[in-house]
Design a protein with these regions (language model features):
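N-terminal glycine-/charge-rich "phosphate-binding" loop or analogous flexible N-terminal tail
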Residues: 1-28, 148
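Alpha-helix C-terminal capping/helix-to-coil transition sites in glycosyltransferase folds
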Residues: 26-27, 48, 170-171, 196-199, ...
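Short glycine-/small-residue-rich Rossmann-like dinucleotide-binding loops
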Residues: 36, 57, 151, 173, ...
Length: 289
């Protein structure tokens, strides 16, 4: 930014107080943010704001509609975390299938572990076939999985069979969520659909927490109705309250929203975020949402 002749002020923490957030950004022409919520009431107070560069793929935490009404350009860091997130999907799956957490505990207890499970030959269901969903499908095929998908926009790709969401939930051994969070996907994986899952199926969510009914998921795990879950995203950002329902659910691998966080992805994110600003300044904005 300095090399481009821009003056900037950096903050090293999220601001949860709306008035304090407004104080930070009210005089800015451009705001760069990652997972800092940026609601309409803040946008309304930013009379000089012309552009927001979101250093994230999802923009559900930004009042995009209010920005559009005010002619504020919003760009995201599309594609920066595709490899990072899709690779974590398989880290979660293998942790569940090969009981990696349990293995560490058994190093000193001497308790015999139950056999693990292989990915090869499993029916792998993908909800949402955007960039991350398709990359996940590609990796799943290399493991020898049969890949099924549900998406509002179907793509003609060899090795992916599109089916209904209900059929996917009912028949797949592994279900991985990759849709963005919006009004139509909130609680998409509902209690009713979780009840449709096979007893030996596992559910993976590296997309957004509110897409899944997490209370229903926790109950299904505690009741033994499904085999496990690997979750990197929650209804609220970690740290979670001690009574959050998934924290004491069995057969889970929980991560504190780090799917995007690899050295390679964070470098790519920084490059895209700055390029979004320079492209906008030159009159040719990119990655506009």
């Amino acid at each position: 930014l300095e090399n481009n002749g821009d003056e900037y002020i950096a903050y090293d923490s999220r601001e949860t107080d709306t008035d304090k957030l407004i104080e930070r950004v009210k005089d800015a022409d451009v705001v760069v943010l990652a997972n800092q919520p940026f609601p309409a009431e803040v946008v309304e107070k930013c009379e000089k704001l012309k552009m927001i560069s979101v250093a994230f793929t999802g923009v559900d935490h930004v009042a995009v509609d209010e920005c559009k009404k005010r002619g504020i350009c919003v760009c995201n860091a599309a594609g920066y975390s595709t490899n990072a997130v899709s690779e974590l999907v398989f880290g979660l799956i293998i942790s569940l299938y090969r009981k990696i957490n349990e293995g560490k505990e058994n190093m000193t207890s001497g308790v015999k572990m139950a056999p693990g499970i292989e990915l090869s030959g499993k029916k792998f269901g993908i909800i949402g076939t955007g960039a991350i969903g398709l990359k996940t499908a590609e990796i799943a095929k290399t493991f020898g999985c049969e890949v099924y998908a549900y998406s509002r926009t179907e793509k003609h790709i060899d090795g992916i069979k599109y089916i209904t969401l209900c059929d996917l939930m009912r028949t797949c051994d592994i279900i991985s969520v990759h849709v963005p969070l919006n009004d139509s996907t909130k609680d998409l994986v509902s209690s009713m659909l979780i009840d449709e899952m096979k007893s030996d199926a596992i559910l993976i969510n590296t997309a957004r927490g509110p897409i899944i009914d997490n209370a229903a998921l926790a109950k299904a795990l505690k009741d033994g109705k499904i085999a496990g879950a690997g979750i990197d995203v929650f209804d609220t950002e970690p740290p979670l309250a001690p009574d959050y329902p998934l924290l004491d659910a069995p057969n889970t691998v929980l991560m504190p929203h780090i799917g995007f966080s690899t050295k390679e992805a964070l470098y790519k994110r920084a490059v895209i975020t700055i390029n979004n600003i320079t492209s906008w300044k030159s009159g040719e904005p990119q990655n506009v949402v």
